[in-house]
């Protein structure tokens, strides 16, 4: 299983710069999908409507594609957002945020990925990438 940060997931389901790269990198692979992904992806798509970058119909299509990929097993729903994972994220923040600039959601994504034993970690966020490398996540290069 691979872990995509939400920025990569948005690119996978909605055309943006680097969408094709993400699509190629994920062909045939199972992708972790947590409640954090669900929240952030939904919010990101709604923000696109607010910014006039997407229509309501496009958002509904993306959300349906997500449901379809969950049903088909391309996305694997894993609910590991719990107090133990939050404690891991707090530990990562205490150890690394002062040097990487990583924010709470960066540390939470990395903590979620770390607890799953993923085979690859993809992110478009420089702070999250720095943290992922420091903690030994299998970062996949572009």
State what each model feature region is.
Residues 1-44, 48-61, 135, 140:
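Short, well-structured N-terminal submotif of metal-dependent ribonuclease cores
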Residues 1, 34, 114-142:
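Acidic, PIN/NYN-like endoribonuclease modules and their adjacent C-terminal/linker elements
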Residues 76-126, 130:
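Active-site neighborhoods of divalent-metal-dependent phosphate/nucleic-acid chemistry enzymes
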Residues 38, 50, 69-73, 117-118, ...:
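Short alpha-helix boundary/capping motifs
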Residues 14, 65-68, 126:
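Short, C-terminally biased terminal segments at protein or domain edges
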Residues 42-93:
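Active-site-proximal, substrate-binding regions of enzyme catalytic domains
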Residues 18, 30-31, 71, 75, ...:
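Generic structural signal for secondary-structure transition and capping sites
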Residues 24-27, 72, 114-116:
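Short glycine-enriched loop/turn motifs at secondary-structure junctions
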């Amino acid at each position: 299983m691979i872990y995509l940060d939400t920025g990569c997931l948005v690119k996978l389901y909605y055309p943006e710069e680097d969408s094709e790269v993400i699509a190629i990198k994920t062909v045939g692979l199972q992708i972790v999908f947590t409640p954090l992904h669900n929240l952030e992806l939904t919010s990101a798509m709604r923000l696109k409507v607010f910014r006039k970058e997407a229509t309501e119909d496009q958002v509904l299509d993306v959300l349906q594609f997500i449901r379809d990929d969950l049903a088909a097993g391309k996305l694997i729903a894993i609910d590991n957002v719990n107090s133990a994972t939050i404690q891991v994220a707090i530990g990562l923040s205490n150890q690394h945020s002062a040097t990487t600039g990583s924010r709470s959601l960066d540390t939470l994504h990395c903590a979620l990925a770390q607890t799953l034993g993923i085979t690859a970690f993809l992110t478009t966020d420089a702070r999250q990438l720095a943290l992922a490398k420091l903690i030994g996540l299998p970062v996949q290069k572009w």
